Amino acid sequence: VSADGLQWSFIPRSGVTFSDGSPLTAAEIAVSLNLARISPLYSARFAGVTDIAAANGMVTVTLSRANGALPALLDIPIVKSGTEESLTPVGTGPYYFTTDEAGACLASHSGWWRGESRPAERIALSAARDREAILYQFSSHEVQLITADLIGTEPITATGNISYEDADTTVLQFLGFNTARA
């Protein structure tokens, strides 16, 4: 961090790879952060950012005014350049999207940089055409987890024998789990 707090430089963790095996670089991070600057979802976080650039293996973020909370605001998905417009962009997380004989799923990324075990090797995904279908799948135990946009125009609300869990995050999330067996 510069003395005036207007420039922050970050060195990417070494050994981090995308799920396709390619390395995470400062250039890849800068591309994702610059795309986030113009994204309706993340642009408010970048209100005080005047420049994001990659050079010499570092990402430098320049601010119009000092902001000690900048690192927390940069908690956004970093995706591989060229895949950002894809419905399934390539990332560095513990799981990646794929399809197999059983259908669409999130598969465990064996090269995940944290190296920690994951709760499941495969997480099956299920599509639903509307909120009623989502609630039906959840209440009939076809799916065990749903996410909901509680500030959307038609938030999903589930009732009955379910459990709500709170988790610290910089992004508002809601997870609902079935707690009874069918």
Question: Where on the chain are the PLM-derived regions?
Answer:
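Extracellular/periplasmic solute-recognition and catalytic clefts
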Residues: 98-105, 124-181
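Short helix-loop capping/hinge motifs at secondary-structure junctions, enriched
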Residues: 16-22, 112-116, 181-182
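Aromatic- and charge-enriched surface segment that lines or borders ligand/interaction sites
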Residues: 1-42, 60, 137-140
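A structural signal for short loop-to-beta-strand junctions that line the ligand-binding cleft
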Residues: 48-52, 58, 93-96, 161-168
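Gly/Pro-rich hinge or "lid" segments in bacterial periplasmic/extracellular proteins
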Residues: 66-124, 129-133
